[in-house]
Amino acid sequence: MVHCAGCKRPILDRFLLNVLDRAWHVKCVQCCECKCNLTEKCFSREGKLYCKNDFFRCFGTKCAGCAQGISPSDLVRRARSKVFHLNCFTCMMCNKQLSTGEELYIIDENKFVCKEDYLSNSSVAKENSLHSATTGSDPSLSPDSQDPSQDDAKDSESANVSDKEGGSNENDDQNLGAKRRGPRTTIKAKQLETLKAAFAATPKPTRHIREQLAQETGLNMRVIQVWFQNRRSKERRMKQLSALGARRHAFFRSPRRMRPLVDRLEPGELIPNGPFSFYGDYQSEYYGPGGNYDFFPQGPPSSQAQTPVDLPFVPSSGPSGTPLGGLEHPLPGHHPSSEAQRFTDILAHPPGDSPSPEPSLPGPLHSMSAEVFGPSPPFSSLSVNGGASYGNHLSHPPEMNEAAVW
């Protein structure tokens, strides 16, 4: 004998119902709340049977406004993590029903004030700034969404109102002050191409354009809004880096030329403190104006020499360090032009076996000067072996001892 799972009596009827793998009388299969007979579909919880409406009313999602259950066929609004009936999602001051995407302010997590009423009754209406709404007359007010024109300035605690099919938005908690982040959204390649094309057309899209992109890509409007914010920030950063790189490239491509440490020497300044001048403006008691080249009528020994570095070397001292002495006019028995030509040829073509003339080698220099001046010295006052004639021919102050001839 089969017993009914509802009334525990034997089933003597011709027909019976099998619910939850148990046999029931036809009249015993009914909703425990409204007592209506369940013929096609029923819901069970803790061994009790419910109809569809009563089951969702008792165990389904509750409306945060009226605390009643929400039927699967009802349209709802979402704000933060709470769900509301359409009739419960209204402004508490003007009773206007708030629509999707409209800006609002949340009070006590389940009461709402529209933007117009909040600004008209807030002390910050003069500033006309949504992100500073927390400094208004009611300190518990917090903005729920953000104006698209100000989305780059501040990431305020806001929520875009969406239908049940759209995802809920989690933002800053007013009391905790910590930002709650949802799961990371992965954007596919096709969706990314669509967003890039939209960004190329309008870098700062309106809400209507974002809604169209949400329908095309299947992404949440908040995700699209954040993607555009990050993209604009990246573009600004790249422009700043490119401008900085251009300035750096221009700086290193054409650096400032270093000025010479010593300006070009003017005539008469080659040896500022020396007794001889390489120009014709030198005057002394031994030489008149332009008398520097008396022994060289054709000019200096080298026609190309303009500085002491370019001039051929003539030793300034003998083997004992004695200066060569002063240069005087040639003796009457000599011919200045022929002797000067000979001296020029010998200096221009020094003997092959003579060492390199350096001031620190007085010995070899003495032998070279002996070969140069030989048996017929061009200068009558030149003394190589001693300093006797030097003292006879020159009574000039000793400051000339350190000077070089050429």
Swiss-Prot record:
Ranges of biased composition (kind: Low complexity): 137-148, 315-327
GO biological process: anatomical structure formation involved in morphogenesis; anatomical structure morphogenesis; anterior/posterior axis specification; anterior/posterior pattern specification; branching involved in ureteric bud morphogenesis; cell-cell signaling; cerebellar Purkinje cell differentiation; cerebellar Purkinje cell-granule cell precursor cell signaling
Signal peptide: none
Pro residues compositional bias, start-end: 352-362
PROSITE patterns xrefs: HOMEOBOX_1, HOMEOBOX_2, LIM_DOMAIN_1, LIM_DOMAIN_2
Composition-biased stretches (Basic and acidic residues): 151-167
GO CC list: nucleus; protein-containing complex; transcription regulator complex
Annotated stretches, region: Disordered: 128-189, 293-374
Keyword entries, A-Z: Developmental protein, Differentiation, DNA-binding, Homeobox, LIM domain, Metal-binding, Neurogenesis, Nucleus, Phosphoprotein, Repeat, Transcription, Transcription regulation, Zinc
Domain LIM zinc-binding: 4-54, 63-117
DNA-binding region: 180-239
Pfam families: Homeodomain, LIM
Residues with the Phosphoserine modification: 162
S-S bonds: none
Domain notes: The LIM domains exert a negative regulatory function and disruption of the LIM domains produces an activated form. In addition, two activation domains and a negative regulatory domain exist C-terminally to the homeobox.
Quaternary structure note: Interacts with LDB1 via the tandem LIM domains.
Protein name: LIM/homeobox protein Lhx1
